[in-house]
């Protein structure tokens, strides 16, 4: 069994390396076009991912016609393909090239600089929206390196390869399994911490708050960190602007923290506010969110399953 596992891991790593190196050898525009093409092909294939996406879109947009939902789901797959193409280019990216490729939102920049001036930590409240791998990478290219929470991949060799790319310009990955102490240190030292806030979680590590009008089990960790460190929480994401042919690093004003003196209530209220901020960004760029994730999988006790 162990031998089979080692062989399987080696094959997975070899395949991942071939794909990334093959795309990485292409000019950026070609690699991205190939990636988008792969995404379009994946959209056409029947399977659980498409069914999950369709179900999620029914929940989020109950009044939307089927044709428009199909357009958004196709965009989701295309965005994933774009992510693959762009990620393959990061090993050879330079700060100069990235600055030409990215437009930074002045709102997000202003609040980031203000927090830095006041020596306050910053939490980038983000999610699987647009090209999230480029998001953290792009900030480090602008000389704002950050730490970010990750769940390591099961294949250690692929994880090492991916982490080398992610951390080229000074970013630092923090394993979610042991994140609390390191995350607190980053924020208390005035650093920036990126957290993907839009994943389904379990009740022991989250709370149920509305997301697109339906309760979703959402991580309580962001609220806990923000309340303990008085960090500035900035909703932000990296999305493709088709008209400008550039990426736009969207930034909203910080989410104001609520403090009532009731810890449990503060966690729930602030988590709900963070989820609402994430929802607003998804509504702005609905064809670039990860609709194929089972966001509403965990249900309150006694409620029927969704998927």
Regions found by a protein language model. Name each.
Residues 109-113, 136, 162-163, 183-184, ...:
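Short amphipathic alpha-helical segments and helix-helix/interface helices
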Residues 98-103, 151, 168-174, 212-213, ...:
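Short, flexible loop segments at the rims of nucleotide/cofactor-binding pockets, characterized by
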């Amino acid at each position: 069994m162990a031998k089979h596992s080692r062989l399987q891991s080696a094959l997975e790593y070899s395949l991942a390396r071939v794909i990334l190196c093959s795309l990485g050898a292409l000019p950026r525009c070609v690699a991205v076009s190939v990636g988008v093409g792969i995404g379009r092909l994946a959209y056409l294939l029947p399977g659980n991912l498409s069914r999950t996406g369709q179900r999620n879109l029914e929940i989020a947009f109950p009044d939307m016609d089927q044709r428009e939902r199909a357009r958004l789901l196709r965009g989701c797959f295309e965005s994933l393909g774009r992510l693959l193409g762009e990620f393959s280019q990061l090993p050879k990216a330079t700060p100069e090239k990235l600055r030409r490729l990215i437009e930074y939102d002045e709102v997000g920049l202003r609040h980031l600089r203000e927090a830095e001036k006041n020596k306050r930590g910053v939490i980038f409240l983000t999610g699987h929206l647009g090209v999230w791998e480029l998001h953290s990478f792009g900030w480090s290219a602008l000389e704002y390196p950050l730490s970010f929470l990750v769940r390591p991949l099961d294949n250690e060799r692929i994880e090492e390869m991916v982490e080398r790319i992610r951390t080229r310009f000074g970013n630092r990955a923090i394993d979610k399994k042991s994140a609390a102490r390191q995350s607190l240190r980053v924020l208390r030292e005035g650093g920036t911490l990126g957290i993907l806030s839009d994943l389904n979680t379990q009740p022991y590590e989250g709370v149920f708050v509305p997301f697109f009008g339906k309760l979703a089990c959402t991580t309580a960790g962001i609220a806990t960190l923000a309340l303990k460190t008085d960090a500035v929480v900035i909703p932000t994401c990296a999305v493709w602007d088709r008209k400008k042919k550039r990426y736009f690093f969207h930034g909203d004003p910080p989410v104001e923290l609520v403090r009532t003196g009731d810890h449990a209530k503060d966690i729930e209220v602030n988590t709900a506010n963070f989820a609402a901020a994430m929802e607003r960004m998804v509504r702005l760029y609905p064809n670039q969110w990860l609709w194929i994730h089972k966001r509403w999988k965990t249900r309150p006790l006694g409620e029927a399953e969704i998927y």
